[in-house]
Structure formats: structure tokens, C-alpha cells
UniProtKB/Swiss-Prot annotation:
Effect caused by changing P324L: In NEDLBAS; uncertain significance
Gene expressing this chain: AGO1
Job description of the protein: Required for RNA-mediated gene silencing (RNAi). Binds to short RNAs such as microRNAs (miRNAs) or short interfering RNAs (siRNAs), and represses the translation of mRNAs which are complementary to them. Lacks endonuclease activity and does not appear to cleave target mRNAs. Also required for transcriptional gene silencing (TGS) of promoter regions which are complementary to bound short antigene RNAs (agRNAs).
A biological process from GO: positive regulation of gene expression
Matching PANTHER family: EUKARYOTIC TRANSLATION INITIATION FACTOR 2C (PTHR22891)
One annotated Gene Ontology cellular component of this protein: P-body
Organism encoding this protein: Homo sapiens
Effect ascribed to mutating H751L: In NEDLBAS; uncertain significance
Modification(s) after translation: Ubiquitinated on surface-exposed lysines by a SCF-like E3 ubiquitin-protein ligase complex containing ZSWIM8 during target-directed microRNA degradation (TDMD), a process that mediates degradation of microRNAs (miRNAs). Ubiquitination by the SCF-like E3 ubiquitin-protein ligase complex containing ZSWIM8 leads to its subsequent degradation, thereby exposing miRNAs for degradation. ZSWIM8 recognizes and binds AGO1 when it is engaged with a TDMD target.
Subunit annotation: Interacts with DDB1, DDX5, DDX6, DHX30, DHX36, DDX47, DICER1, AGO2, ELAVL1, HNRNPF, IGF2BP1, ILF3, IMP8, MATR3, MOV10, PABPC1, PRMT5, RBM4, SART3, TNRC6B, UPF1 and YBX1. Associates with polysomes and messenger ribonucleoproteins (mNRPs). Interacts with LIMD1, WTIP and AJUBA. Interacts with APOBEC3F, APOBEC3G and APOBEC3H.
The protein's name: Protein argonaute-1
UniProt keyword terms in alphabetical order: Cytoplasm, Disease variant, Epilepsy, Intellectual disability, Repressor, Ribonucleoprotein, RNA-binding, RNA-mediated gene silencing, Transcription, Transcription regulation, Translation regulation, Ubl conjugation
GO MF, one annotated term: RNA binding
Interaction with guide RNA: annotated segments: 309-314, 522-564, 708-712, 751-759, 788-813
Length: 857
């Protein structure tokens, strides 16, 4: 979700800012690591030191889409040239703001206009008023960037942004900060009536000493402009409409409704008058039976079917009277349209969740190796020719054509300590290391374990199971996590309904049962049920395995299973070699990771989920989780104070120490809301400490982790590129040139890019009682990226932030209502929510016995 520079998303509750916490200044720049020459997809913007005039515009009717508003303003500027606008080229943001280079001759008065736009069928009339608002100083912006002594004036950045986007907003379809245009010369269908559109992202950002234009290629899913009949066939997998001589079944209608609800359609039965409507529902009855009250000329009202009406009024004999109608406009108005007279309107972005297949098609269509993406961005820049844009020229702005050169540093990777007799160490190379010949730092001995196979017996025979367990035991023994003897129980089962009775039987029959290995037949509701029963109901450790990995075992897959199992049972896979850890470890320190995940768009009833995890030892290796539900789309973690308090108590129970420092990595914060969220959450963390002990005031460092940005880094020297995808090396850090003019932020690409172009994570320090130097925090963050237990690779964000994401993701499965849902995003929207807030809160609460384990690994 992208909020504008001016702030919050609509509808989010944010507390007023009583005291504003100032983000810390950059404590100098980092020096550790091997220098590397990079190119960033940032282009220098040169702005004149002038005043820009800011006007407020008000358009009635006021709920028009921005596209219409832009048209209205464009007409107004052309039409009132002689009286008001002269040769000026105003720029407009599509909502309330207009900027000009010289003042309009209206003084401080409000001026009203009437603007007529020729429409299809009839003209549309708009009332527009303009009033002077303020002078925006670009000289101040210059001063802020160069001196670093005054805050960056956001209104100046906003004016620049509007000027830079004005032309593109008229030419293309804007989405957030990106622009898209219909496919030309390529076609990437996604299925289900959706297709890929390519476009570009553009934003202006304050950087060291200058403004920068961030340009990136981007892609998103749009609905294909096509007849609704064809859309329905795609959604329901009907190859040919003539194969559907019968009315839709209930389940077909429900699936179709879910996809088309909320989309705009245009009608084809009125000649040139292609009126557009928004779909609010799909009728249960076919067009031949769906009736509505028709008023006759005599004034009498009769019930008439949609099919009859179209025959009488338009002389149109429906070809598919057995198919339902679309209900459009307002529900209470009963406007019905047969599917066959409707087309899906072009240029509608798909905000609903993509299916797994669509997602993988999308990735295949959009993944570009780093050198290819670099080439594409450069080509995009040339084609955009910003310096020829009349609006940009009007404001005296100049844009450099070449990517910005930056010197980054490749940080040294930490050494990892394993256990066993030989206490081997592993040295990561390009973000990867090997566990062969090494044993877990602390391996668990598994004595009592069970197998539940939910794959059919013909797919997974007993000898296949036997081979799998033999191979798993061999690998686990090598890894120092011996699985002793045969399973105490090994049975086949079917369907989610058999999970709970089976698990209860296991819990009651086998005392000391440590683990249930569950074999799944592909994508199935059984997974959600296994996790609900295991994590929340009975407190039993479960490890799911796909049947394909049982039938065909590979050492890699089995080894990865062991990484997860050992941790779930309380083991430690490896630790950072103690002597190379940062000075912050000299006193007790807790690492917290926090995330908020929202339900997919269009799913208004499901709650948002917040998760906070905390480290429970000094390595840091073991973590404990807390999770809550809250109002949908709420960005602040409302219950943070209680969650942190729980974790501090757990830390004390685990270590017998009170942390003197709290390092908080916060994922998933929209840029426009940083100040409000920091304000609320920093006070919540302090509050948690004071509630435990009146004078307990550990130093807090609050770091926002952002992955959803468009900064990309490329090797300037071809010889430094890594692997097939030609990416920058793992450990590449940048904290100059493209970062904030004076606040404490940096980019760190901590993982090795395998596919596509690596996305460095952006770290923004919003509060720092602990006075970290740039080197200390960058190295600490990089080291934490090596402590993620599920793989022997460095990951793209620090382990605590990653775990918080996993915990929130797991809670989505705990919320699955097994009557309706599969938890896979393909269900009827809005169950698990006929339940009240208390029931939802209870559904995500993890069982006492699971609470202290890393069940989410």
C-alpha cells in the first residue's frame, strides 16, 4: 500500500502526535568491508531555487476518479486560457492540488468555473473552484538537502513529484506510484480473465545533497478487456460456452461472483452509448427467470423477466437465457444485465489475490537478470525523455540521463559454530554454506514419534514410507539429531475431519510423544487443520511433508526437514561464533521482530494479524512468539505493550537476566505513516518495561525494515557480478549518495540473488537510545540475517523480522474455518469472521505447550 508523501492511508486510525520523536541523525558512514562500485536506478534531478505557487482545487461532483478530474482540469486550463491561465502550464495531482511557476491573476480570492466535457450521449457539467493556498519554496528544499540542518520540507518534495508525474498521469494508467499501459507487442495471460501489464515506477526522493528520481520497471495484473461470457468461461474453466447448455451450479455461480463483483462492465446493446456500470452481484436465477418491476406507460407496474424485456425493448433474443444476470449499480435499485451484453472495461487493475499458478506465471513473465533489468531501466529513461517534457521544462527541472554511481561495501560474513564431537565451523561463501560433515550445535534425540499419512495408499505405499523413514533417520543421525527406532504409530488417514480425533488418540496413547510427521497429498485443507490442532488445540509438534518428497527423497529436502524439526523440538542448529559478535552482546540484549499482515484486498471481513517475536538466548538462536488479531487494515500494532511485556517475562524465565537493550526490527510499515507508528509503538515498548518495574528503562533501538521499494543496485564492473542472475554479492551495503540527506538509514543486500534482480532491504533507524555506529548496526543486522534456522543461507531480512512474518502467516491458517475455508486464498470471502472478535482472538492463541517452542519454523 502506498500512501502519498503527505501521510496516512484513508480510514486508518492514528493517534494525534502530542510529542514528536525526532529520528536520529546519521552517526557517520560505515567503513567496514571491501569497497565495490555500483550503479543505482536513481537519476539526479536539478531544481531551480524558485518559489512555486500552490492552489487548492475543488471539483463537484466530488467523488470522481482521478482520471475524470484530470480531464476536467485540462479542459478548464484550455478553456480559460485568456482570462486566467495564459501560457502557464499548471500541474495537477488528480485530487486537490495544482501548482504553477508564476502566480495566477486571482489574488487570494476563490474563483469558480463551470466546465463542460462532451460525453458519450450527453455532456457532463462540473463546478470547479480554485483558491490560492501557499507559496512552496524550492530554495528551502535546496538548503535542507545541502546543509542537513533543517527538516526536508515535504510540501516542496510533493510539488516536485506532481510536476514530474503530470504528463505520465495523462498518458498512462497510474497505479500507486507506477504507470502502466495496455500490452503492445507482448501478451502474458495469467488465466482467470487476468493478464500482465508492464509499466514503470517513478518517485522523487531526497538524497544526500540533491533530489533523485527513482525509476524502475514494474509489472502488475490487470483484468483482460473481453466479453463477460469469455471472462466467465476463463474463471470457471469452461473451454467453450456451448459446452454449458445448463444453468450454472451454485458453486460455479459463487466462484464467478467472487471474481466479477466490484468490476466495471460496459454494455454493448446501445450502439455508441457504451454505458459503464459496477457489478454488485450475480443473480441466482437465469435471465429467462430473473424478474424486475417494470413500469408501463399506463403507470401500472408488472413483473417482467430480463429476457422478455431485452426482446421487447431492444429486439434482442438472448443467446444464453439460461445464464444468470449481472446486478449492477446500487443493490437496492435492481438493475440487471444479461452477461452477453456486457464487456469487462479495459484498464482495471486486479487487487484480488492471485492464485498460486497465477503468481508463478507472473514471476516467470517478470523475472529479469540484473544486467537485463539494468538495460531495461536505461532504455526506459531514454524513451521517457524527461528533459523534453513541457511541464518539466516549465518548472525549470533537469534530469540526468545516467544512473547514479555509488560506492558500496561488501561486509564480511560471520562464521557459524556447529556442535557434535568435531565442533566444526562453517564459513559462508556468497551467502551460502554447507552442513555436510557437521552436526547441530544442540541436536535433540527423538525417541517417540509418529507418522500420519494423508496421501492415498496407492500414491504412497508402505515400502515408500519405510524407505523415507530410513533415509530421514540416516540424514538426521549424520546431523546429530538421532531419530531412534521405528515410529510408535504409522497409519493412513483421509480428510481434515480425521486430524483432531487421530491427534487426540496419539496424545492420550503415547506418553512422551515428541513429533508427528504428517504426509500431505499436495495442496489440501488438511495442512491448516494439522496446524490448528497441533499448535493451538493440543500443543503437539508437527512436521508436514509433501508426498512427492516422500516418494522421491533427496538429501537436500531431508536435510532441510531436519533443520526445521530440530528447532521445533527445542534444539539449536548453529550459533554465531561468539568472539565476532558485536559489542551489544556484552550485556543482556533482546532482539524483537514485528510484523502486521493484512487480509487480501476485497476481503473486508477478515482481521489483520500482528506478530512479535523475541530472542530467548544470547546466541541469539531461540525465539518465542506472540500473536494477536486486530481491526482490518490497521497499521499500528495495537497490543504491542502487552506483547513485548510477555516476551520480556519469557526472556527472564529463559535466561534469568533482564535485557539492558531492546533491538526492535519492524517490518511492514507504509512510508507515509512512519512518524505516527513510531510514536505509538515506541511509547508502547517503554510502557511494557515500566509496567514490569518502575525504574526499568532499557535502551531501545527501533529499526524499520522495508522490502517494498524500488531501489535496485547493479555492479558497475561486469566481473563483480555473481552467478547466473548477475547480481551484487551478498553483504553489499550502501549508506551514501542515494540514502537520506542526514537521517540514519542504509541499504543492505544480505542474500545471494538466485532468480531475477536482488532487492536490497532498506533499514531506517527511527529511534536509537543505544547510540550504534553505522558499522555496528550494519554488521549486527547482517549477522542476524545468518541466524534464520530454516536454511543454510543468509536471508534477505534479519531472522527476528522473518520469524514475525512466519508467525503472522501461520496465524492465518489458525483462523481458517474448516467448514468453508482452505486457507489457500481461493475460498469464499469472509468466513472465519462470522466469528466475533473474542473467537478470532482465541483462534490464534497458541497452546501453552507450544508457546515456548519455535512452532513456526
Amino acid at each position: 500500500m502506498e500512501a502519498g508523501p503527505s501521510g496516512a492511508a484513508a480510514g486508518a486510525y492514528l493517534p494525534p502526535l502530542q510529542q514528536v520523536f525526532q529520528a536520529p541523525r546519521r552517526p557517520g558512514i560505515g567503513t567496514v568491508g571491501k569497497p565495490i562500485k555500483l550503479l543505482a536506478n536513481y537519476f539526479e534531478v536539478d531544481i531551480p531555487k524558485i518559489d512555486v505557487y500552490h492552489y487548492e482545487v475543488d471539483i463537484k461532483p466530488d467523488k470522481c476518479p482521478r482520471r475524470v478530474n484530470r480531464e476536467v482540469v485540462e479542459y478548464m486550463v484550455q478553456h480559460f486560457k485568456p482570462q486566467i491561465f495564459g501560457d502557464r502550464k499548471p500541474v495537477y495531482d488528480g485530487k486537490k492540488n495544482i501548482y504553477t511557476v508564476t502566480a495566477l491573476p486571482i489574488g487570494n480570492e476563490r474563483v469558480d468555473f463551470e466546465v463542460t466535457i462532451p460525453g458519450e450521449g450527453k455532456d457532463r457539467i462540473f463546478k470547479v473552484s480554485i483558491k490560492w493556498l501557499a507559496i512552496v519554496s524550492w530554495r528551502m528544499l535546496h538548503e535542507a538537502l545541502v546543509s542537513g540542518q533543517i527538516p526536508v520540507p515535504l510540501e516542496s518534495v510533493q510539488a516536485l513529484d506532481v510536476a514530474m508525474r503530470h504528463l505520465a498521469s495523462m498518458r498512462y494508467t497510474p497505479v500507486g506510484r507506477s504507470f502502466f499501459s495496455p500490452p503492445e507487442g507482448y501478451y502474458h495471460p495469467l488465466g482467470g480473465g487476468r493478464e500482465v501489464w508492464f509499466g514503470f515506477h517513478q518517485s522523487v526522493r531526497p538524497a544526500m545533497w540533491k533530489m533523485m528520481l527513482n525509476i524502475d520497471v514494474s509489472a502488475t495484473a490487470f483484468y483482460k478487456a473481453q466479453p463477460v461470457i469469455e471472462f466467465m468461461c476463463e474463471v470457471l474453466d469452461i473451454r467453450n460456452i456451448d459446452e454449458q447448455p445448463k444453468p450454472l451450479t451454485d458453486s460455479q455461480r459463487v466462484r464467478f461472483t467472487k471474481e466479477i463483483k466490484g468490476l466495471k462492465v460496459e454494455v454493448t446493446h446501445c450502439g455508441q452509448m457504451k454505458r459503464k456500470y459496477r457489478v454488485c452481484n450475480v443473480t441466482r436465477r437465469p435471465a429467462s427467470h430473473q424478474t424486475f418491476p417494470l413500469q408501463l406507460e399506463s403507470g401500472q407496474t408488472v413483473e417482467c423477466t430480463v429476457a422478455q424485456y431485452f426482446k421487447q425493448k431492444y429486439n434482442l433474443q438472448l443467446k444464453y437465457p439460461h445464464l444468470p444476470c449481472l446486478q449492477v449499480g446500487q443493490e437496492q435499485k435492481h438493475t440487471y444485465l444479461p452477461l452477453e451484453v456486457c464487456n469487462i472495461v479495459a484498464g482495471q487493475r486486479c487487487i484480488k489475490k492471485l492464485t498460486d499458478n497465477q503468481t508463478s506465471t507472473m514471476i516467470k513473465a517478470t523475472a529479469r537478470s540484473a544486467p537485463d533489468r539494468q538495460e531495461e531501466i536505461s532504455r526506459l529513461m531514454k524513451n521517457a525523455s524527461y528533459n523534453l517534457d513541457p511541464y518539466i521544462q516549465e518548472f525549470g527541472i533537469k534530469v540526468k540521463d545516467d544512473m547514479t554511481e555509488v560506492t558500496g561495501r561488501v561486509l564480511p560474513a560471520p562464521i557459524l559454530q556447529y556442535g557434535g564431537r568435531n565442533r566444526a565451523i562453517a564459513t559462508p561463501n556468497q551467502g551460502v554454506w554447507d552442513m555436510r560433515g557437521k552436526q547441530f550445535y544442540n541436536g535433540i534425540e527423538i525417541k517417540v514419534w509418529a507418522i500420519a499419512c494423508f496421501a492415498p495408499q496407492k500414491q504412497c505405499r508402505e515400502e515408500v514410507l519405510k524407505n523415507f523413514t530410513d533415509q530421514l533417520r540416516k540424514i538426521s543421525k549424520d546431523a546429530g539429531m538421532p531419530i531412534q527406532g521405528q515410529p510408535c504409530f504409522c497409519k493412513y488417514a483421509q480428510g481434515a475431519d480425521s486430524v483432531e480425533p487421530m491427534f487426540r488418540h496419539l496424545k492420550n496413547t503415547y506418553s512422551g510423544l515428541q513429533l508427528i510427521i504428517v504426509i500431505l497429498p499436495g495442496k489440501t485443507p488438511v495442512y491448516a487443520e494439522v496446524k490448528r490442532v497441533g499448535d493451538t488445540l493440543l500443543g503437539m509438534a508437527t512436521q508436514c511433508v509433501q508426498v512427492k518428497n516422500v516418494v522421491k527423497t533427496s538429501p537436500q529436502t531431508l536435510s532441510n526437514l531436519c533443520l526445521k524439526i530440530n528447532v521445533k523440538l527445542g534444539g539449536i542448529n548453529n550459533i554465531l561464533v561468539p568472539h565476532q559478535r558485536s559489542a551489544v552482546f556484552q550485556q543482556p540484549v533482546i532482539f524483537l521482530g514485528a510484523d502486521v499482515t493484512h487480509p487480501p484486498a476485497g476481503d473486508g471481513k477478515k482481521p489483520s494479524i500482528t506478530a512479535v517475536v523475541g530472542s530467548m538466548d544470547a546466541h541469539p538462536s531461540r525465539y518465542c512468539a506472540t500473536v494477536r488479531v486486530q481491526r482490518p487494515r490497521q497499521e499500528i500494532i495495537e497490543d504491542l505493550s502487552y506483547m513485548v511485556r510477555e516476551l520480556l517475562i519469557q526472556f527472564y524465565k529463559s535466561t534469568r537476566f533482564k535485557p539492558t537493550r531492546i533491538i526492535f526490527y519492524r517490518d511492514g510499515v507504509p512510508e507515509g505513516q512512519l512518524p505516527q507508528i513510531l510514536h505509538y509503538e515506541l511509547l508502547a515498548i517503554r510502557d511494557a518495561c515500566i509496567k514490569l518495574e518502575k525504574d526499568y528503562q532499557p535502551g531501545i533501538t527501533y529499526i524499520v525494515v522495508q522490502k517494498r521499494h524500488h531501489t535496485r543496485l547493479f555492479c558497475a564492473d561486469k566481473n563483480e557480478r555473481i552467478g547466473k542472475s548477475g547480481n551484487i554479492p551478498a553483504g553489499t551495503t550502501v549508506d551514501t549518495n542515494i540514502t537520506h540527506p542526514f537521517e540514519f538509514d542504509f541499504y543492505l543486500c544480505s542474500h545471494a540473488g538466485i532468480q531475477g534482480t536482488s532487492r536490497p532491504s532498506h533499514y531506517y533507524v527511527l529511534w536509537d537510545d543505544n547510540r550504534f555506529t553505522a558499522d555496528e548496526l550494519q554488521i549486527l543486522t547482517y549477522q542476524l540475517c545468518h541466524t534464520y534456522v530454516r536454511c543454510t543461507r543468509s536471508v534477505s531480512i534479519p531472522a527476528p523480522a522473518y520469524y514475525a512474518r512466519l508467525v503472522a502467516f501461520r496465524a492465518r491458517y489458525h483462523l481458517v474455518d474448516k467448514e468453508h475455508d482452505s486457507g489457500e486464498g481461493s475460498h469464499i470471502s469472509g468466513q472465519s469472521n462470522g466469528r466475533d472478535p473474542q473467537a478470532l482472538a482465541k483462534a490464534v492463541q497458541v497452546h501453552q505447550d507450544t508457546l515456548r517452542t519455535m512452532y513456526f519454523a
